[in-house]
A protein has these predicted regions:
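Conserved small/polar residues in nucleotide/adenosyl-binding loops
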Residues: 296-302
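Flexible inter-domain linker/hinge segments
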Residues: 1-58, 67-74, 104
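Cysteine-nucleophile active-site neighborhood
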Residues: 108-203, 209-211, 280, 286-294
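Catalytic beta-strand/loop cores that center a nucleophilic Ser/Cys/Thr
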Residues: 208-263
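Phosphate-binding active sites in nucleotide-utilizing proteins
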Residues: 58-131
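General small-molecule cofactor/ligand-binding pocket signal
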Residues: 2, 91-95, 247
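Glycine-rich phosphate/pyrophosphate-binding loop
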Residues: 45-49, 188-225, 232
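A glycine-centered loop/beta-turn motif at secondary-structure junctions
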Residues: 259-282, 286-289
């Protein structure tokens, strides 16, 4: 008889099963050799850190599917894993972007150590995401934008720094005069459903010395994608001359994959989904760096944050 007891974290389940010798029973039933005792020390160390954090930090996850947090399950787990590396518990605050505007953004996000603007599709809630980006940028709060979150960062910068007040993505407004986010030219004639999706893993070259390169510890990475729209490189010179840099690009196509604002404590947007590659054994370096700098921001005197 094997007990399936409640545990504080799902990551402890294999340890509980091992203590009851369930692994040996399964191997025996399958007539497989069980000569070597498994080394679960790294998993045990991870679980110990998850269960006994030295501190807690509050990070906002701004999205439009927040009524169902499992929509962001991969991001949530990435924060658990990155938190363990930093000896802290990340308390996620799910903030519905449809309910954010200029009048309440400070109330909703002002006490956060970091702000993540989540992926998604479509126009609903987009202005709230852009408002959250603006708050993070102008209040110098650590920021990570993923996929649509990165695109919102580009749109916000175009509107409020470059002065293109109608700037947006052609996903939201096909007739916009400033399509800073757009379909690639070769995609525009594709009509088959899903045909314009950029899916799977692609290489990315990072600029040496950028915050992204510092987090990864290398300039050559490969990350997974799931999106249709891209940074419009026709605007790249405008962005870079005003302080938003393209620090990651596909080496074959030149498509922009990572943007940063160097004159900010930590402002990073990725077109790809870093959460897809985060694991217990290898927490994603961007999440690890984001959590670390968010904790540093939390400990700064209030007057030093702006």
């Amino acid at each position: 008889v094997m007990e399936s007891i409640d545990v504080p974290t799902i990551y402890e389940v294999p340890l509980v099963m091992h203590r009851q010798h369930l692994d040996e029973v399964v191997l025996s039933k399958l007539d497989l050799p069980s000569e070597q005792e498994p080394d679960l020390s790294s998993l045990q160390a991870f679980v110990d850190k998850v269960k006994n954090p030295k501190r807690t930090i509050d990070i906002a996850l701004v999205g439009k599917y927040t009524e169902l947090p499992d929509a962001y399950k991969s991001i949530c787990e990435s924060f658990i894993q990155a938190g363990a590396v930093n000896d802290c518990k990340v308390k996620l605050h799910y903030v519905n972007s449809e309910k954010i505007d200029a009048s309440n953004v400070g109330e909703k996000l002002g006490k956060m150590a970091g702000i993540l603007v989540a992926p998604g599709f479509g126009n609903r809630g987009i202005e709230g995401k852009i408002e959250a980006v603006h708050f993070a940028r102008t209040h110098r709060i650590p920021f990570l934008g993923i996929c649509l979150g990165m695109q919102c960062a580009v749109i916000e910068f175009a509107r409020n720094v470059l002065g293109f007040k109608d700037a947006t993505s052609t996903e939201m407004d096909p007739a916009t005069k400033h399509p800073v986010i757009d379909l690639m030219e070769e995609q525009k004639g594709i009509t088959a459903k899903g045909g314009t999706m950029r899916l799977g893993a692609y290489p990315c070259s990072l600029v040496p010395g950028s915050k992204a390169a510092q987090a990864y510890g290398t300039t050559q990475i490969q990350e997974r994608h799931r999106h249709r729209y891209e940074f419009n490189s026709e605007y790249l010179k405008d962005f870079e001359s005003h302080g938003m840099k393209a620090v990651g690009a596909n080496p074959d196509t030149g498509l922009v994959e990572v943007v940063e604002i160097p004159d900010h404590p930590w402002f990073v947007g990725t077109q790809y989904h870093p959460e897809y590659k985060s694991t217990v054994q290898r927490p994603h370096p961007l999440f690890v760096a984001f959590v670390a700098v968010s904790y540093t921001h939390l400990t700064l005197p209030t007057t030093s944050r702006v």
